[in-house]
Amino acid sequence: MQCYTELLSPSGVTHALAIPFLSASAENLVVVKTSVLQIFSLLKVQHHSRGETIETKSARPDQVETTKLVLEREYPLSGTVVDICRVKILNSKSGGEALLLAFRNAKLSLVEWDPERHGISTISIHYYERDDLTRSPWVPDLSSCGSILSVDPSSRCAVFNFGIRNLAILPFHQPGDDLAMDDYEFHLHQDDLNQVSDHVGNGLKSKDSTVYQTPYASSFVLPLTALDPSILHPVSLAFLYEYREPTFGILYSQIATSHALLSERKDSIFYTVFTLDLEQRASTTLLSVPKLPSDLFKVVALPPPVGGALLIGSNELVHVDQAGKTNAVGVNEFARQVSAFSMVDQSDLALRLEGCVVEHISDSTGDLLLVLSSGNMVLVHFQLDGRSVSGISLRPLPTQAGGTIMKSAASSSAFLGSGRVFFGSEDADSVLLSWSSMPNPKKSRPRMSNVAEDREEASDDSQSEEDAYEDDLYTAEPETPALGRRPSAETTGVGAYIFQTLDRLPNIGPLRDITLGKPASTVENTGRLIKNACSELELVAAQGSGRNGGLVLMKREIEPDVTASFDAQSVQEVWTAVVALGSGAPLVLDEQQINQEYRQYVILSKPETPDKETSEVFIADTQDLKPFRAPEFNPNNDVTIEIGTLSCKKRVVQVLRNEVRSYDIDLGLAQIYPVWDEDTSDERMAVSASLADPYIAILRDDSTLMILQADDSGDLDEVELNEAARAGKWRSCCLYWDKAEFFSSTGPALKQGTRCELFLFLLSIDCRLYVYRLPDQQLISVIEGIDCLPPILSTELPKRSTTREVLSEAVIADLGESWNPSPHLILRTESDDLVIYKAFASYIKGESHTRLSFVKESNHTLPRVTTSEKEMQSNEKLSRPRSLRILPNISNFSAVFMPGRPASFILKTAKSCPHVFRLRGEFVRSLSIFDLASPSLDTGFIYVDSKDVLRICRFPSETLFDYTWALRKISIGEQVDHLAYATSSETYVLGTSHSADFKLPDDDELHPDWRNEGLVISFLPELRQCSLKVVSPRTWTVIDSYSLGPDEYVMAVKNMDLEVSENTHERRNMIVVGTAFARGEDIPSRGCIYVFEVIKVVPDPEKPETDRKLKLIGKELVKGAVTALSQIGGQGFLIAAQGQKCMVRGLKEDGSLLPVAFMDMQCYVNVLKELKGTGMCIMGDAVKGLWFAGYSEEPYKMSLFGKDQGYLEVVAAEFLPDGDKLFILVADSDCNLHVLQYDPEDPKSSNGDRLLARSKFHMGHFATTMTLLPRTMVSSEKAMANPDSMEIDSQTISQQVLITSQSGSVGIVTSVPEESYRRLSALQSQLANSLEHPCGLNPRAYRAVESDGTAGRGMLDGNLLYQWLDMGQHRKMEIAARVGAHEWEIKADLEAIGAEGLGYL
C-alpha cells in the first residue's frame, strides 16, 4: 500500500497559445506543462539601465519599456494535454475567447474565464472513447496514437484527429449562423458524443436573435477515408486562412513512408485541401498536390499577406498557395537525393529541420522565425509579387542578433503581437522574445514597409542591388544567390531583425540523473554558528539538453547565505529602523548615499520578566554591529510591540505596551503618547500595531482600536474614529499602502483631484473583514465569514456554517517581486496554518465601481507538531505572541515571515503562485529586514534563533523561488547524462556529451573508399562526443576533464566502495564508469569499464578549488556494451551489465577486473540495482521485463529468484522495502508505475518464480530515475511516538522512493500503514466525487491503468489528497466526518506522504 505524491510540478513547456482570455482586450499567454495549465498576462514595465524594473505607471523618462509575464492562475490537470487552440464563442463570461484543450485518450474540454471566480469555468467535456471506433484488432490503442487539434480561424468549427483515422468535428455557433435549429438542438443526438456541463443558463444569443443552449453544436465523427478513400496514413492537418467556409489542408500518404524503402516510395506524400459543409456533414476537395517529398511532417497555416500553407520536411520547406502553386527550397544536400520535387537549392545552409518550430513574427511581411532542434534560429522570408509567392529564402540568425538565445529545441510557440514572440521548450528555459528591425542607411524606405505600390514599382536592378546589401548585413563575404531564386523588394526584410530576451519561464527538465552529496560550507571558520543553518545532504540532478545542460540544486528549505553571526544571549526580539540623515529620502540610492545619508539601527530586546525587558541599540556598519548609546530609548524597560519609522524616515517610533515613544534620528526622545483611553481614563495596553507613514494603528487589550497620525513636524496626534470603528471589537488590524491603486478602484469613487493610497483592514471578533479608506474613513467593503475559509471571499453573504476555524491574525501585504507586488490577505490560524488569499476586483453590473473579492491560493505546507515536552516548555517560556512580520523589500521580494518552528517565508514570483518556504535552522524568535549597505548585495535580513545566535543573512544567490522547493541552476554548457558524488573528495563527477560531426575512419583497411568521404558528402551526421568532468561544489565549476573516443559513449557513472587489493583487502571510494563503443548497427558493440579515483593535487594558486583530479586506476575492455553498473555484496565487488550478461567483477591490484560470477540475460539491461548489503538485485530489461536475482559470496554465484510476467518495458526500477515485505517499483515507457512484490509464500507466485503485480498507477510523466532514500520521522509521528518504546527504531528505518521525470517533475512514493491507507483511500474517493475538477476531468480515470484485473489495492494519489487542504472549513469537516476521521488524523497522514520524510534535505 503506497502513495504517490508530486513534490515538484513539471516545468517543461509543451504547448503555448496567445489568446485574449481574461477579457476581450486582454493580452494573455496560456502555457501547458504536460499536466499543468498556466494563464499569464503580459505586463508592460519600465526597465532601468542599471537593471531596476518597475511598473509602467510609475516610469521615469530615462527608462525603456519592456514586457514581463505575470501568472494569473495555475491549475494541475488530471490528464495529459496533447494540443490547445483558441475559440471565439458567443457571449463568454469574460468577453474574451474560450480555450479548447485536447487530452490523451480522445478527450476535448472547452473552458472560459469566469471573472466572478477569478478562474476558469468548464463549459463542456467531450469524450470520443467509443468501442466501435477503437475495437478493431489492427487499430492501435488510443494512448499509443498521436492526436491533432485544429480550429478554424473564424471559430466556426474544430477538428480533432484521433486514433489514426478518426476525425471528430465540433461546430461552434457564430453571429449570423443560418443553421437550422432542428439540426442543432440541445438534446444529444445518437451520433453525438458530448457530455455537457451545467452551463446552460438562459441560453446564448447571437446577433440574429437565435437562442442557443450551448456555444457549440452537436459534434460528429467521420473516418478520414470518408473525405477521401486514399487518406490511409495521415501526417498533419491545419485549418487555413481566408476561406468563407471551414477549410483545412491535410498531409497524408496512401502507403506508409519509409526511409529504408526510399527508392520505391520516393515522393509519396499528398497535400489536399478540403472544405467542410457542417450542415450536410460533407466535404468538398478544393485542390490536391501529389508527389511531395516523403519526409514532410507538418502543415503550418500562414495568415495574410502570404496565405496558403507551409509544409515542413526534414530537408526542405514547401509553400502551397490557395491555387495549388508550390514553391520549395532545399536546406541541405540530402533534399535533392530524397526527392525529385522541384525546389530552390539552399543546401549550403546545412540545416536539419527535424523537430523544428516555426512562428510568424510580422503581420506586414509574413516573415517567419524557425527554431531548429539545436536551438539556433533561422529567418524565413517569402518573396511576394502582389499576393503571389514567387520564392522562399532562409537566413540563419547570427549570434549578435540573438540567434543563439534558445539553448535547445523549442516545443511550442506563440505570436503575441507588437514585436513579441514566445517559444516554449521542454529541454531549456522558455523565453519571451522581442524583435526590432536593424536600420540600414542604404535603403530609402522603411525596412518593415508593406506598401503594395513599392513592390510594383521597384525594378529588378534595384532589387538585386538591395539583395547585395542584405548579403553583407551579417556575413563578411558575399554569398552566391540560391538557384532559381527570384529577387524581390520584400527581400529587404531578410536578416533585418535583432532579438532580445524579455522574460523567461525557468525549466529544470529533463532530469536525467540524480545524486545526494554533502553541501559545501558557504562561510568558513564560523564553527557552530552556521552548523544548524545548512542541511545534512543536498539533492543534485543533471538537467537540460544540448548546450543547456547543467546541474540543478534542489533545496527543500531556504538555506540563507550567512554574512555575519553573533552570540545573542537571551535576545527574544530583533528590530531594525533605517533613518534618513539628509534632507529627504531620494528615490534612487547610489553607493555613497547608502553610506552617508542613511543610518540603520538594530534594536535587541531581552526580557527580564513577562512585563519588563531591556533594549540594546546598535548601529549597523556594513556587516558589523556597533553599540550605540541611547539613554532615552525605553528607559522604563517596557515591552516593545513594534518599531518603525515615520515622517519620511525622520522619526523612529517605538510602540510599547503602555505608551508610544517617538525619537529623532539620533534616538533622542521627541514625544510620548499614552495608550490608555483618554475619554474614560481606563488603563489600556497595546497588544499589536501596524505602521504606515504617517499612521500608526494600535490594537489594545480590550479589542479597541487607536489610530495615531504624524503631522509635518513628526508629532503624533490621535485620529478621531467614526462610530463603527470606535465601537467595534477587533481581533487584528493592518495598514496597507495601495501603491498599485488596486483598492482605490474598488468601492465608491473619490472626489476629482484627490488620491488615496492608504487603507485600513480590520478583522472583527466575529471574523468580519472591514476595509476603510484613509483619511476620510470611508467604509469600502465588508466581507463576512472569514473564518469559514471559503474558496472565494466577497461581499456576498456566505452560507451559514457551524464549523469555523479559530483565527489568530490577519494581515494584508504585498507578495511578489519588487517591480510587481500584488496584495494578498494572509490568515493565520490558532494551529499556525497559513491561509493565503489573492485580492481581485470583480465587476458588478449596473455599478460604476468594482467589487473587492479574494480567491484562495493553494498552500499544502502543514505546520509541524510540537514533538516533546522540552520543546513545549521552551516555547511556552515566552508567552508573547509572535506576529507575522511584513517584509516590504527583502532581496527584491515583497514577502511575509512567520516566526516559530518552523519559521517560514511566504514568497511569490511574477511567474508563480505564493509558496511557503521554511527557513533552515532552529526555532526563530524574531526576524527583521537588514540593509546590507552594499550595491552588489540585495537587502537581507537579521534574525535570532533559540540557540541564542544572531545572524545577518541574505537569500541564497542565483536561487529560483518559482516552485515549491528552492532551486539553483548551474550551467555546464554540455548535456549531462550521468552524475555521481565522489564521497572521498567531496566532488561531483559528470558524464557529459556534446554534438560533433561524425567522420568515417581513414585508417580502415577493409573500406578504403571511406577515405574519400569528404568528396562525396559535406553534410556530415552528428553524434555525441562524451567526456568525464569533475565539478567542485565550492564554486560549481569544472576543475578536471577526461575525454573519451569519438565513438565511445558513457552509459553509467557510479560511486562505489571497492576493494582495491586482494591481499590487504583495502577499500576505497572509486568512480566506476561504463561505456559503449557504437560504430554502427552492422558492427558488434564493445564496452569498457573504467575505475577512477579523484585524487588530491597541487591547485592553481588563483583557483584553490582545482585541487582534485581524476586518476585512472583500472580499465577493462569487454565484449558488449556496458549499460549499467552497481556495487554488490559485502566484499567490495561490482556488477556490470555487459552485452547480454550481468557479471560480478573484483578489482585487482594491477587494475584489471576479475569476473567471479555471471548471469545470462536477454536483450538490453538498462536498470541494475542492489538492495544495499543484501546481495539481492533487480535487472531491468528494456524489452523483456524485470528480473529479481540474488548474489552469494560463498561460493560466488548468481541465482534467479523471480521474474515479472508482463514483459514490461522497463525504463526505471527500484526496491521499496516495507517492514517484512519487499516491493519493487517499475516505471514503463507509457508513464505507468507498477508495484511488484516478491512473496514466495503466496501460491500465485509459484514459489517466488513470479513477481506478483500488486497495483498500477499512471504518473503522467516519463520517469528517468528512481532512487531509494531513507525516510525520517515527521513531526506528527514523533509527537505520537512513546520515547521509551522500541517502535521508534523500526519507524526510522522506513524508506521511500524518489522519482524524477523528463518533464522536470519530482515525485515520491511512500509506504502507507494499513490504518492510514483506509483513511486516505476513503478520503480520495470523497474528493474525486465532490470536488470540481479543472476542465471537467476525472482524476480516478487519469490514474487508472487498463489491466487484466489482477492488480490489487490501488496506489493513492497524493496530489488529489492534498486538495482537501484547499477546501473551505465546512466542506473540509464534512468530508472528514464522512471518512470517519478527525482533522488532525488526516493532517498527520498528509504530512507523512509528503516531503517531510526527507528531513536531511
From Swiss-Prot:
> Might you name a Gene Ontology BP term for this protein?
mRNA processing
Localization: Nucleus
**Care to name a GO molecular-function term for this sequence?**
RNA binding
Q: Which InterPro entries match?
A: Beta-prop_RSE1/DDB1/CPSF1_1st, Cleavage/polyA-sp_fac_asu_C, RSE1/DDB1/CFT1/CPSF1, WD40/YVTN_repeat-like_dom_sf
- Gene Ontology CC annotation, any one: mRNA cleavage and polyadenylation specificity factor complex
The region called Disordered is annotated at 434-489
Q: Which Gene3D superfamilies match?
A: 1.10.150.910, YVTN repeat-like/Quinoprotein amine dehydrogenase
Task: State the UniProt keywords alphabetically.
Answer: mRNA processing, Nucleus, RNA-binding
Acidic residues composition bias: residue spans: 454-474
Protein function: RNA-binding component of the cleavage and polyadenylation factor (CPF) complex, which plays a key role in polyadenylation-dependent pre-mRNA 3'-end formation and cooperates with cleavage factors including the CFIA complex and NAB4/CFIB. Involved in poly(A) site recognition. May be involved in coupling transcription termination and mRNA 3'-end formation.
Cite the PANTHER family for this sequence.
DNA REPAIR/RNA PROCESSING CPSF FAMILY (PTHR10644)
| Similarity remark | Belongs to the CFT1 family.
Q: What is this protein called?
A: Protein cft1
Q: What is the lineage of its organism?
A: Eukaryota, Fungi, Dikarya, Ascomycota, Pezizomycotina
Q: Which gene encodes it?
A: cft1
